[in-house]
Each structure stands twice: as C-alpha cells, then as structure tokens.
C-alpha cells in the first residue's frame, strides 16, 4: 500500500487520538468483524449497512458509530495541518453554512469558533460519549439508555459536518494525496448508514446534497 493517506486511514495502529476498540469475544466485537467482512468482500455499501437478521439495532448502530468516529477522525487528521486558525477562522461549509459549537460545559450558547478549535472540541466530546459505559455499554446484557439514538443522532450530525468542511475547504489536499476515491468510499458508507436508519435530519445533509446525488444515487 503505497499511498500515505491510506496507510494512515487503514493502519489500525496509527490514530489521530486514542482509538476505541471492541473487546475480543464480545458480541459487539463479532458484529464489528461481520461489518468489516462485508466491506472487505466488496459487498454493495447499501446492502452492507443493513441490519443483519437476528441482531439488535442499537448494537449495530453502536459498532458503526465507533467505526465512523475512528475513520472521520483519521480523515481530518490527514488534512489538519492545512486547517488552521488563519485558513479556517470560522467552522463552516462554504459561504452558506456556519457551524457553531455548543456543549454543557464552557459553551452553553452556540458559539462561533475556528474550524480546528471546533474539531478539537468535537472529537473530545464524541470520545467522552463513546467511552461512557452509561451511553455505550460494552457488557452484553447491559441495556442501552433510552436516549441512545438521540445521542447517536447528535454524534453523527456533527461528524457529518467534518465531511462538509473537508470536502468544501480541503478537497485540494485530499486530491493532492490521491485519496479522493477512498474518502468518497468512507463518505458513501457513512451516508448510506445514516439514511438507512434515519439518523440525520435531511436539512443537515443539505450542504453536500449535489455531490451526494452524483455519488450515492
């Protein structure tokens, strides 16, 4: 594998930040293997995201959220040297879309931030969610919280914004690395998954609507 971008994205030992893994022998580890096997076999991505017979939706969603977090994290990591306070003073997706940060700690009101600052806060926030046993339980038999899908929708909507920013503001870097096809595959996988289970509002998908229509339909 000569492409340096691919080495980073698919090398399991190289991560932008600590990677959440599934414990061998657990139900979710088996689901993770099943999902990866479908992708590696070249199965149509629309089919690959469908819930396998006999599996629980929350388990399937949890596995994919962690996987998407890891992949999007790495994609952003490869272009992050060109995403600076100066180049991207506002987290946006072109002139029409500005993304403001809000959380339960320092930023209780939607706040305009630079893209790198927004990304930092976002990745930290998602990491806290997926490592919280009360939200993403790892033990089989431990129930998911009632608001699990609500939390997931927020995570995935915010991860989608990373795709928006990367495609609109940093695609030249992706092209320079010769990695368009591989980033596009990650995006298609993500898009098919969130639309299969209705995990992102249509209005959130609007910034990449034209590209998605060409790529995913």
UniProtKB/Swiss-Prot annotation:
- Gene Ontology annotations of biological process type: signal transduction
* GO MF annotation: an example: protein kinase activator activity
Q: Which UniProt keywords apply?
A: Metal-binding, Zinc
The record's listing under InterPro entries reads: MOB_kinase_act_fam (IPR005301), MOB_kinase_act_sf (IPR036703)
Checking SMART domains in the record gives: Mob1_phocein
Q: Name one GO cellular component term.
A: nucleus
Provide the residue positions that the database annotates as binding Zn(2+): 83, 88, 165, 170
Q: Does the keyword Metal-binding apply?
A: yes
Q: Which family does it belong to?
A: Belongs to the MOB1/phocein family.
Q: What is its biological role?
A: May regulate the activity of kinases.
- The name of this protein is MOB kinase activator 3A
Organism annotation:
Bos taurus (Bovine)
């Amino acid at each position: 594998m000569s492409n340096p971008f691919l080495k980073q994205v698919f090398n399991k030992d190289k991560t932008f930040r600590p990677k959440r893994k599934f414990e061998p022998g657990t139900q979710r580890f088996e689901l993770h293997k099943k999902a990866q096997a479908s992708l590696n076999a070249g199965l149509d991505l629309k089919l690959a995201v469908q819930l396998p017979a006999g599996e629980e939706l929350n388990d399937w969603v949890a596995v994919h959220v962690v996987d998407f977090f890891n992949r999007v994290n790495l994609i952003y990591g490869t272009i992050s040297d060109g995403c600076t306070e100066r180049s991207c003073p506002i987290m946006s997706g072109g002139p029409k879309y500005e993304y403001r940060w809000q959380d339960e700690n320092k930023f209780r009101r939607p706040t305009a931030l630079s893209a790198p600052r927004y990304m930092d806060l976002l990745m930290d926030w998602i990491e806290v969610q997926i490592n919280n046993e009360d939200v993403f339980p790892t033990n089989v038999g431990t129930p998911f919280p009632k608001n699990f899908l609500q939390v997931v929708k927020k995570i995935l909507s915010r991860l989608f914004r990373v795709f928006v920013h990367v495609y609109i503001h940093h695609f030249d870097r992706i092209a320079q690395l010769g990695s368009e096809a591989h980033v596009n595959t990650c995006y298609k996988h993500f898009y098919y998954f969130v639309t299969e289970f209705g995990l992102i509002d249509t209005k959130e998908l609007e910034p990449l609507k034209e590209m998605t229509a060409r790529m995913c339909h």
